[in-house]
Amino acid sequence: IDTRDWSSDVCSSDLKIKDYRIYHGFYCGVCQDLKEDHGQTSRVTLTYDVTFLGILLTGLYETETKREEYFCAMHPFKKHLCLRNQWTAYAADMNVLLSYYNLLDDWEDEKKPVPLILASALKKDVKRLKEKYPRQARAIETYLQKLKACEQEASTDLDRAAADTGEMLGEIYVWEEDVWADTMRKIGCAMGRFIYRMDAYEDIEKDRKKGNYNPWKPIAQEKDFDDRARQILMMEAAEASRQFEKLPIIEYVDILRNILYSGIWTKYDRIKSREKETRRK
């Protein structure tokens, strides 16, 4: 699962300017936590998906959030809003864990130096994070073992790798085994399945040409493949939204709904737009 290109961005055209600023304030908050807790290099691994998780946990636990303003390399001439709390710090920690294992996987697959260099820069922090979050770290390691087995066996089970991804992300979404743990785990599971399926859907042509593992391959040549794939993706997205609506979240709910109902489809829209452009040529 490529943690650098996940799907939980906002749909900016459907979001109020105030909420869009808050969303990017949380994104910058996670980025600042990465810098302070894990060093400058870790910032290149930041994803929108951990930002979603940070906002989700903030809304659920109604945590006090510190408002700051910073200059940075991305905003060198004007200070920008930065929102931080314990959940942006947790999101940053999870980002480092996920990115580290993903980079190692990239290195094993392609033997390119950049992933190994980045992973080496994160290694010391990962050791500390594994001690701090043993359940989450174990879930990621177990997931990668299961995914490797799927690839080696060239499994034709459409649901196997997606379910493994969901199981892993479900553990990341759960902070502790409290009254909300079951619902949070289910949201994470549905999001994980959606993300894995969407990534695989995007890569189907590339994987077919290169002979890489892709669970969509057995049905990709069928006449109704695109419709069937969209229906499956819609089912996963609907389950994530259904579980989310069980949570008593008031603050930031418009941002979170924007992501769940619209934002997670931005990658799908890009895929379809590229396909349309290709057909025109």
List the predicted regions and their residue ranges.
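Single conserved hydrophobic/aromatic residue that forms the stacking wall/gate
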Residues: 1-10
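N-terminal ordered "arm"
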Residues: 14-64
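Acidic/histidine metal-binding catalytic segments
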Residues: 111-117, 248-260
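A mid-sequence, solvent-exposed acidic-amphipathic segment
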Residues: 154-198
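Acidic, carboxylate-rich catalytic segments that either coordinate divalent cations
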Residues: 262-281
